[in-house]
Design a protein with these regions (language model features):
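N-terminal subdomain of nucleotide-sugar transferases
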Residues: 1-54, 59, 66, 82-83, ...
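Active-site-proximal region of nucleotide-activated glycan assembly enzymes
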Residues: 107-119, 273-330, 343-344
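Short acidic, S/G/P-rich loop/turn micro-motifs used as interaction or catalytic elements
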Residues: 158-163, 193-195, 234-237, 263-266, ...
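Conserved catalytic-core segment of nucleotide-activated headgroup transferases in glycan assembly
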Residues: 163-176, 312-383
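Generic beta-sheet signal
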Residues: 188, 260, 279-282, 297, ...
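Conserved nucleotide-sugar phosphate-binding/catalytic loop shared by glycosyltransferases and other
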Residues: 201-238
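Short N-terminal targeting/anchoring amphipathic segment
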Residues: 247-263
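Short, Asp-centered acidic motifs that coordinate Mg2+ and/or phosphate
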Residues: 255-256, 293, 377
Length: 383
C-alpha cells in the first residue's frame, strides 16, 4: 500500500467513526491527489462524497474537500441545500459557510453558475432573517423627509492597505462622493468578510484580513480628502456590535449607503434603515446582496437578468453602469532590463488574482497558436 492509499484509508476510517478530523492527514491526501488527471480526481471526489454520514458539520467538510478536488458546482449546490435545511446550525455558522462558498465561487469561475448564485442569494436571505430574531432593537426605515441629504455612508467589509482592491475601491468611492457630489462621507469597515466567528470544519478555510490597530482610527485620508472612519470589532459578526452600528445609522440618517462588495450581513440589515446600493468588486457577475440596488456593467445585463429573476427580484434591482477602477499610485519602477526582457520583444501581460484557475489548457492552446519568437508572456499576480 503506497502513501496515498494509506492516507485515503485513514481518512475513511476517521469519517466512519465520526472522529475529529486530522487536518494534517487531509492536507497530505489533497496534495497527493490535486495534480492527478481529471478523471482520477473525479473518481476520488465521488468516492469521498459517498462517505457522508448525515452529520451536518462532517458532511459540509466532505463537500468542501470534494469541490477542491473536482471543481464541480454540484458540490456547492448540495452544500447550500444542506445548510438551508439544517436546524442545528445557527446563523453565524451559516454565515461562515456562506462566506466560504462565496470565496470558492470567486476563486473558481467555473463554479459561478446560475443555480449556485441563486443558492447564495437564498442562503443570505435566511441568514438575515435568523439574525434579526436575535436583535433587541427595532429597525426603523428613515423617511426621505428626515434624512440628511449632505451625508452618505460608505460600507466595506474589509479595509486594509491601498494594495488591496476593495480597500482602494472604497476610498475611490468616498473621494468621488465628497469631491464631485459635495457630500460628507462616513466610511464604515464592517469587518465581517470571511470571518472565523461561527467556524465549522471546512477544507482550506479562507480568512479575511484585518488590521486591529485601525480600530483606533476616527479618520482616513485619500487624495487630499478626509473621511470619518469607524471599524467594527474583530469578532464580527457580533450582535452587540451590529446593533451599535445600526443605532448609529438610525441616528445619523444618511441620504443613502454605498456598499462596496455588498455581501456583508451588516450591509443587509442597514438596507432596512436607509436605501443601499451595492457596487461589486468584479465586472463579470452579479452580487448576492440584500441591498435594494446594485450596479451591474451594461455588458452583463443579459447575463444577470435570469439570475436576478430566479432569485425572486425584478430588474429594478439592477442599475446599469460602467465598471470602473483606477490604478494605485506607482511606487516601484521595473525596466525590461531588470527582469531580462529584450527591448524589441512584444510583451503580453496577464494580470489577475486567480491565474491558476483562469489560465486553462484551452487558453494555453490559443496562446500557443499566436506566439512567435519575438513575443513574451509575463504573468503578474497569483498563479
Amino acid at each position: 500500500m503506497n502513501r496515498e492509499e494509506e492516507l485515503y484509508r485513514i481518512f475513511k476510517e476517521e469519517l466512519s467513526k465520526d472522529s475529529k478530523i486530522r487536518y494534517s492527514i487531509v492536507d497530505e491526501l489533497f496534495n497527493s491527489i490535486k495534480d492527478k488527471n481529471q478523471d482520477l480526481k473525479r473518481k476520488y471526489a465521488s468516492e469521498i462524497h459517498g462517505l457522508m454520514t448525515g452529520n451536518i458539520t462532517l458532511d459540509i467538510f466532505i463537500l468542501s474537500f470534494c469541490v477542491r478536488i473536482d471543481i464541480d458546482v454540484k458540490y456547492i449546490k448540495e452544500m447550500q441545500e444542506k445548510v438551508m435545511l439544517s436546524d442545528s446550525l445557527d446563523w453565524r455558522q451559516k454565515y461562515f459557510i456562506y462566506q466560504q462558498i462565496g470565496s470558492l465561487i470567486f476563486l473558481n469561475p467555473q463554479l459561478n453558475e446560475k443555480d449556485a448564485v441563486v443558492g447564495q442569494w437564498k442562503l443570505i436571505e435566511q441568514i438575515r432573517d435568523l439574525c434579526k430574531t436575535e436583535l433587541t432593537i427595532e429597525l426603523r426605515q428613515v423617511s426621505d423627509e428626515e434624512c440628511n441629504k449632505n451625508l452618505v455612508i460608505v460600507m466595506t467589509d474589509q479595509f486594509i492597505t491601498i494594495q488591496h482592491g476593495p480597500t482602494k475601491t472604497a476610498l475611490d468611492r468616498c473621494y468621488v462622493i465628497k469631491k464631485k457630489m459635495h457630500k460628507n462621507v462616513f466610511l464604515i469597515n464592517t469587518a465581517d468578510a470571511l470571518p472565523l466567528v461561527g467556524e465549522v470544519p471546512f477544507f482550506m478555510i479562507q480568512v479575511g484580513n484585518h488590521i486591529p490597530e485601525y480600530i483606533e482610527k476616527t479618520e482616513v485620508e485619500w487624495k487630499g480628502e478626509k473621511f470619518t472612519y469607524y471599524q467594527c470589532d474583530e469578532g464580527m459578526p457580533d450582535i452587540g456590535e451590529i446593533e451599535q452600528v445600526l443605532l448609529a445609522i438610525m441616528k445619523l440618517k444618511p441620504s443613502m449607503i454605498v456598499a462596496v462588495g455588498g455581501t456583508s450581513i451588516l450591509m443587509a440589515l442597514a438596507n432596512e434603515i436607509v436605501p443601499t446600493i451595492s457596487i461589486g468588486l468584479t465586472q463579470s457577475g452579479v452580487v448576492t446582496t440584500l441591498t435594494d440596488y446594485q450596479v451591474v456593467d451594461y455588458n452583463m445585463l443579459d447575463y444577470v437578468k435570469p439570475i436576478v429573476e430566479q432569485s425572486g427580484r425584478t430588474m429594478e434591482h439592477i442599475i446599469p453602469g460602467k465598471f470602473t477602477f483606477s490604478l494605485k499610485p506607482q511606487t516601484e519602477f521595473i525596466t525590461r532590463k531588470d527582469i531580462g526582457i529584450p527591448e524589441n520583444a512584444f510583451v503580453m501581460a496577464m494580470v489577475g488574482a486567480r491565474l491558476d484557475q483562469e489560465i486553462t489548457d484551452e487558453f494555453l492552446t490559443m496562446l500557443e497558436s499566436v506566439m512567435n519568437d519575438r513575443m513574451m508572456v509575463v504573468l503578474i499576480g497569483v498563479c
